Structures are given as structure tokens and as C-alpha cells.
Amino acid sequence: MSPTGTRIDHDIILDIVPRGAKVLDLGCGDGSLLEKLVRTKDVRGSGIEISDEGIRECIARGLAVLQEDIDHGLKDYPDRSFDYIILNQTLQAVKKPHVVLSEMLRVGEKAVVGFPNFAHWEMRMYLLLRGRMPKTEYLPYEWYDTPNIHFCSIEDFDGYCDRFGLRVERRIYLSNDRGGRVLRGVCPNLFAESAVYLLSKK
């Protein structure tokens, strides 16, 4: 959270997406990010969510949302039908991350991807000292009820982008530790709790 009580990753994404853009938010949850984009950036926004609860909350916010499983792809959407496709704090929960990321850059001109960094030093120490699966603000679940199935680090994601020829236009590293900005810049894989990437095709 920021000092004003807003989510830092949401603030970053609000800064990335230009006013009036056509946006699709995948795994939009309760619609809080999409609602901010619609209200503050005047985007033409819609969302996709799989949970019944998330759908109800999005509808209550007056958002355009479809109930679908993004692991099945975005076959109903033509190429380049959106300016920005967002996948925030959802990458680790999808069954087929490569399919989802590929579809994002087929359907959208640019992709915004936010994910928790499983190589953060606190995660490493938690596992080393406690011998248990780590729990953090971004990964608050117990091992037996977590929706997360594909954990990755910042180094993992950079390697993925290199392997599949994705252009990284921006990388923003996030942490609740304000004093860690320099350390995040020097060694983000160790000191960033999460990251937000802006991607496009080369």
C-alpha cells in the first residue's frame, strides 16, 4: 500500500495506461483496478473474471465484465482489438501462462503484467528458517488453499521475455520497504517484492 492507502501496483498501472485507451483486464477480480482506470483515465474498459463473487462485484461497480477462463485463450477476440491488455497479480494462478501471455500480445498492442517475485529475500528466509511455504502481502494463502500454481521470479520472467522475443518497454520494481529503492535497482530479483512489466512484440 502507498502512504495514501492505495495499492502501489494499481498506481503504477494507472500511470502506464494512457487516457482514453481501450483496455481489457484479465482476471480482474472485484474490478477495483478497472474501475479506477475507467474513472480516472477515461478508458474504454472491460474485464474477464472466472469467479462468481468477482463477477457480482464488477457488476455492482457498473463494469463491463465477462465470466470466462483465460486459460482457454482469447479466441473470441480478433487481433489487435485492444490497446492494452492487463494481467495483474494473476499470472501465478493461471494453468497455462505461456498461452495467456501469447494471447495478450495477439489481442492487444501492449501488455501490462504484474506479478509477485518469488525470489524476494524475505521469501527465501521464510522458507530457509521456518521450512514452510512463505506467506506475504502478495501471496497470503496457505499451501493447501492457494490459487497460485506457477511461481516465478523476476529473473525467470526476464528469461521468458528473452526466449520468446518480447520487448520489455518498462520494468517497475515494487516493495513496501521505502529504503530499499537503491537495492531494488541494483538487485531486483532479491529486493523487489513484486514487479510490473510493460510488454510489446518485437
Residue ranges and their predicted role:
Residues 19, 80-81, 107:
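Alpha-helix C-terminal capping/helix-to-coil transition sites in glycosyltransferase folds
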